[in-house]
Amino acid sequence: MSKLNSVLPAIAPHCIDMWEHFPTLRDLDANCTSVVEMGVRGGCSAYALAAGLERSSSKDKWMLYLDINDCRNPKLEELASEAGIKIEFRQTDSRYVELPECSLLFIDTLHTYGQLKTELDLHHTKAKDFIVMHDTDAPWGYKNEVDDGSPNRGLWPAIEEFLDDHKATWRLLKRYRNCHGLTILVRV
């Protein structure tokens, strides 16, 4: 077992809203060459994404993880580098950053309709294969984490609108309802 994969069971107890999605993220990411993660918090999903990227057959694997707060994780960076993954952290607001093209875009930022709608509108063209979003079911699927002034509430309406507006390019691959929800969109 790789070092990145061996960390997942150890951090799972600290990731109660995410740990059940570790295998899904790891397996999905194994088919990718690059990942951009928006919204890092404690780094739970970042470890799972890096563990999947490590399995990729690509020789040029990279990961960019960003958050509005300083969530840089030196241990993650060390393990990812040892696994042959170029990794970078940026402290920035996901609504005001130019992202590079990537295989997989992972979104777990502020849980409001307005935030997710803006992020999807701005960044969906950068994801070449998948867009993955966490917290798409209870409690944030249908209510906002904070009042953002938008008429709609929660992440799920933003996803439904996005899919309606982008039928020619994106479709729902899978919606998990456990651990606050995980939604995977795949490029058509």
Features from the language model and the residues they span:
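A short alpha-helical cap/connector motif
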Residues: 1-188
